[in-house]
Every structure is written in C-alpha cells, then in structure tokens.
Amino acid sequence: MTTNNGFDSLHSHAQRLKGASIPGLLAAEPGRVQDLALRVGPLYVNFARQKYDAAALQALLALAADRDVGGAITRLFRGEQVNLTEGRAALHTALRGDVVDAPVAAEAYATAREIRQRMGVLVRALEDSGVTDVVSVGIGGSDLGPRLVADALRPVSGARLRVHFVSNVDGAAMQRTLATLDPAKTAGILISKTFGTQETLLNGQILHDWLGGSDRLYAVSANPERAAKAFAIAADRVLPMWDWVGGRYSLWSAVGFPIALAIGFERFEQLLEGAAQMDAHALDAPLERNLPVLHGLTDIWNRNLLGHATHAVMTYDQRLALLPAYLQQLVMESLGKRVQRDGQPVTTDTVPVWWGGAGTDVQHSFFQALHQGTSIVPADFIGCVHNDDPYTINHQALLANLLAQTEALANGQGSDDPHRDYPGGRPSTLILLDALTPQALGALIAMYEHAVYVQSVIWNINAFDQFGVELGKQLASGLLPALQGEDVAVADPMTREILAQLKG
C-alpha cells in the first residue's frame, strides 16, 4: 500500500532494480563500498549491501527534502510541539546535550542537568551505604532501556552494586529475583511516568512489603507527589521526569538511575555524551551524509518500495543481546500507526515487524529462513571491532561469522541441487562500534531514535504517542474483579467462556 505521490519516482527505481543483484550493484558502482559508508564518532555504518543504487538513493533524498526532514529535525531539537496529539514537545535530546540555540531546549537542558546532579548524589550515597543489590521495578520504557544499557555495560567484576530488573506483572518474576537477595542489603527503585501503571504498582507493593517499608525505596516519576504518597517514599528519594520525554526515549533522564547504579555515574554521563555527539551530527550534517537520515530512508525503501514486512537486528556481541527487544519498542511503538498527524488514514504501509537476536546463536535458530525462506528480511548486523575480554580467538571467530553471514545473505551461492541453492539478494546494513563503550552505545541508540523520527516525518505520523496500548489495559482492569470473584457483566462471549474456565 504505497499510493502517495511523493513515492512515484521511487516506484520506477524499484521496478528498474527489480532484477538487480547486490554483487551486480557493487560491480556497477566501483566506489560504492566507500561512498555508502559513514563514520560518526565511534560508529562506522555501511549501506553498500542495500538493494538501491546511486540514482535510487538520490530519489530517496529528494523525498526527504520534499518532506522537509531537515526542518523537522530542527523543530524537534528546538522543543516545538512535534507531539500534536498530546500537545507536547519531545525533548529527549535536551537530556543529554545543549546542541541548539532555543530557549525551550535550553531550559529543558538546565532542568535535566540539575536533576542529574541530584541523581549523582543519590548514586554515591547508595554506593557508600552498605547496600549490595538494587531491584528496579518498571515496564516498557521504564525498563527496556535501563535494562539494555546496564546489561551491556556492567563490569564483569568489581561492581559496587548489583542491579536486578523486574517488569512483568507475573509474580514468578519477582519471586525469583527476591529469592536470591537479602532484604537488609537491598534497595528498590520504582519507575513509572504516571505512577498509575498496574504492573509497577503491584510489583512495587511486593517489594515494599519484602523490604519491610519504604526506608530504602526510591522512585522516578512525572507525578512525584503520587509516587511519594503511594509508598510513603521521602521526597528527597523521588526523582522527577517530565511529560516532554516519552517513556521509550527516557533512559537519558532519571529513568537511567538504575543504569548509573549498575555502571557508575561517570560512565552514565559518558553514555549521554555519546548520544549528544550523534545529536549534533543529526542536526548539522547534510541529508546525503546524515547517518540517521540514511538509515531511516533505507528502512523506507525496504518497507515501501521493496515491500518487506519484517526487519531483523543481529547483535554480534552478547552484551547487546537485549538490543533487539529495546528496538522493538522504540520502533514499533513509535511507528505502529495507521493514521497521519491530521487523523486521516495513511497512504503507505508503516512499520514492519522488528525482531532479532544475538549472533552466533541466531545462526542456529532462524538463519535457515533468512537464507532460503520465501520472505526476504532486511537486517542490521551490529558488531564491535575490539573486545574487552581476554578470549581473542573467540572474538575473531565472532567477527568472521558476522562478515560471512552478511556476504552469504547478499551474494548467495548457486547449486544444481535446489536444496543447497542460496538465492542471495538479502539486504543488510553493517554497523561497527570501535568498542562497546558508554559513548559508542549512546551514539548507537541515538542513531536509531533519529532514524525512527525520520521515518515518521516521511509517513506524516506521530512518533511520540502510543494510544494503541491503552485498550487492552482498560479491558484488563475491568476483568480483574471478575477473576477475584466479583460478579462482573462481560459482553464478549469468548471472554465470558474463558472466565468460566479459569474460575472452575
């Protein structure tokens, strides 16, 4: 479904390239590998194995110019009201740097810096308190980002604090976490933007009771009064966040409190520095050399012009194993929309399904389908040039597999035996971090954030609301009393029957 006139010339390019092979594109454009490579700080990204040529890329860039992608990026940074449905700015960039001369953004940056200083005081106090473990309770944006960064960057040994994450309302998750801990040496953090999230409130109550009160409870919320009241948490242990920061963009805020506890406050600030470096690039680089713009346009090409319905992310670094889950929320919650900013139906398909895993494990699970299945799945392959562990041969083998898989997916290999024939033609983007440092991870995450925004501008949708998550939560709230024995009228016949089965 791509009927928008802005895509007309792109359709002709897609048709022209229908029979092209990726090796053929590389041969036809001798400088392609260098021309389609960009470096931004610690990140190197190469698009040469995508299935477009220079002419098609110019048409994509013309579409971006026509949709005023550059102006939209500036409006985002300046703190203009880009979240129209909720009447808000989206100033997550101001959490990590002061890169634009605009009063709203400058005020947000100053506010965020002040709260970050408060957070640093709390981090150091906890490090010196005798507490050994911290349980962080949150879900969605209050969990996925902090969990990813803490897992990726936590030291192998010598950490002052061990941080554990609980998100699911399933009591088994909390039970398994608490079973390994000593309540006398444990603190808890409750993270919720509204402090009305069912999962966080229920898990928070379990944690509060297990700790024997609120003396070692902390909270992060855009509703600090409600947070303090719900669990009697002292005001000096409640850190604010703001309605101009969406949950899935909030790890840079006080939502990153558990990150700072897990990796140290200085390294948390280095994470922000890496993101700010990518912000400056996204804001200042011309479209044709703008990494997030090119990444976003590549995703537009694969979705709308080539018709690919899913996108895979393979992290050839075990420490980034949680990145695909994080990106699922970032991309699919931001871009999973069926109406434009003015409420009219979209005229193109929007977000594909994002999924993935860590290499080389994934080679022994779903790579069979990637190589020989009937659906072509564009992919991002992410690796690190340098490793931090002492097992050099293992790291060399890991990188050899990364390179081999991208080559095999793109080039394929013919065979007289159809069962052993590899068709190739599977596009991928290669992303290399110099090493898995806080700066590099910050830059990587910020790149994806901006690429998502670029796509939202092209599709004319709002990347910063998420009304699609509300209906199921509302229905669950109405059904909970029925499972607790109350007589509740249930209109849906299937739900009514299953409730009867559940209640015996």
UniProtKB/Swiss-Prot annotation:
SUPFAM superfamilies: SIS domain (SSF53697). Pathway: Carbohydrate biosynthesis; gluconeogenesis; Carbohydrate degradation; glycolysis; D-glyceraldehyde 3-phosphate and glycerone phosphate from D-glucose: step 2/4. GO terms for biological process: gluconeogenesis; glucose 6-phosphate metabolic process; glycolytic process. InterPro entries: G6P_Isomerase, G6P_Isomerase_C, Phosphoglucose_isomerase_CS, SIS_dom_sf, SIS_PGI_1, SIS_PGI_2. The active site is at E333, H364, K473. Its EC number is 5.3.1.9. It is found in: Cytoplasm. It comes from the Bacteria. It catalyses: alpha-D-glucose 6-phosphate = beta-D-fructose 6-phosphate. Transmembrane segments: none annotated. The keyword Cytoplasm applies. Catalyzes the reversible isomerization of glucose-6-phosphate to fructose-6-phosphate. Belongs to the GPI family. This is Glucose-6-phosphate isomerase. It comes from Stenotrophomonas maltophilia (strain K279a).
